[in-house]
């Protein structure tokens, strides 16, 4: 139910995080790279720290808290909203419409 992803790489996006959120999993990750943009406002974030000992301590504390609170009513409401939002936002229909609009605008600029 929880996707524990203590990333130390500045990713530009994360398909695994998107798929996890679409499945209704809570994502616990760092705020490095575009992970915040990919997972916000639903992800649970740990501030990235180049001191990996500090990062490990902070991440472990945050993950334990997420495990403890996962089944709370408040968190389950958040997970349901997350799943619904991600499945609408990242569906093939939504993506294809975005590309269509992009190309339509590009054609209009040439005219």
Where are the predicted features?
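Acidic donor-binding loop of glycosyltransferase active sites
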Residues: 1-12
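Secondary-structure boundary/capping motif
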Residues: 12-13, 55
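Short alpha-helical segment that forms part of, or immediately flanks, the ligand-binding pocket
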Residues: 17-22, 33-37
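Short hydrophobic beta-strand element within catalytic cores of glycosyltransferases
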Residues: 26-29
